[in-house]
């Protein structure tokens, strides 16, 4: 459970809108906009962690709702160590969503915040809460940055020398572009979803009265957060989040000691086949991810090269071109996204 109950639910006179003066009513849509942005951010964090975790599973039957595969992994490790820097509303919501939807175990989540005493509900669930950004960076495989923009430079200074090459920094800090993050961290495994909001009729009412976690247990709401497509809420991720997630998954496969052939077998097993298409034309191949010039040097036994996630978000890639012309893949990834929200 989220641990926080809205005692004012159903009491109109105690709702936020009731205390707003008429001259400020035009600003009320900003509240709904904030809710929708947070809903989408949490949903995409869940999908991303599910995808990475699926690349760390030893075999079927481990509680992962994604389609099962049985490729033995070198490290034989199923855990994904996730950290959150920033104990404000967004950081807390991400932690609760990861736990309540069964994505990450509480003991595999750490939060660094200046006031860990305010996170008692998460600590009671088993989340380690402290104020030590450097130690958190050393421990983590994924770090969600949920701090204020003004705090970012000092935080980056604290963590950049402690980041492992494979650690993915996932930034939800507004107003700080990817190029600036790369400069501050001297790191290439960075993801920064770039959200565009387009107000539409009825967009601000949907799911607003429920918690983020409750919304993400509702399939109709989950569908509204689908990546890369304008839905009725008017949210779109602009910077190739789908492509970046897949390249991050390939990096995780390489970290696990999988060859390129094994990595593709894993991803093909994850992506649902939703239509009766020719099997050969509906499978990922090396050409979907690397250039034709590199194919000749890539054997089935060798791993994929290590992909720079910053470059993937800023330039056209073989996968972005392949995705654009492959209806089966877009449909399959949509189904894979929805599968991330099915609790074990």
From Swiss-Prot:
Pfam families found in the cross-reference section: F420_oxidored
Superkingdom in the source lineage: Eukaryota
State the coiled-coil residue ranges: none
Report the EC code(s) recorded for this entry. Answer: 1.-.-.-
Q: Does the keyword Transport apply?
A: no
- Signal peptide per UniProt: none
**Keywords tagged on the record:** Oxidoreductase
Q: Name one GO molecular function term.
A: oxidoreductase activity
Per the record, the similarity remark reads: Belongs to the pyrroline-5-carboxylate reductase family.
Protein purpose: Probable oxidoreductase.
Protein name per Swiss-Prot or TrEMBL: NADP-dependent oxidoreductase domain-containing protein 1
Organism whose genome encodes this protein:
Xenopus tropicalis
- Which lineage ranks, top first, belong to the organism behind this chain? Eukaryota, Metazoa, Chordata, Craniata, Vertebrata
